[in-house]
Amino acid sequence: MTISIQGISVSRGIAIGQVHCIKRDQIDTPEYLIRKTQIDSEILRLDNAITNARKELRAIRDHIPSSTSINISEFINTHLLMLEDNALTEEPKRIIKDRLCNAEWALKLQRDALVNR
């Protein structure tokens, strides 16, 4: 099987060969249950995190030198679009309410559900 991958080059030339995954890092996501009385504050925490992520991505995008490849800006724009997707912004709120789990865990559960679709 042949797979062709396109992207931004970091060095000159073409690389051909087998891919070896040395280490698969996973983000250490805190997973804990919350009380029903904490649902609103946990959803607010998620909303604030999404808002801050948008601000940070926009700030990064706005400071990219004009000489940089347009692909970099488009990469950031893609992430901004993901932060507008209800599947990643609203569904975790339902998970927080239904499962009484913290925001990070709810987002991880939703991410896994989307990946396994």
Predicted segments with their positions:
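Non-catalytic, soluble scaffold/interaction modules
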Residues: M1-R117
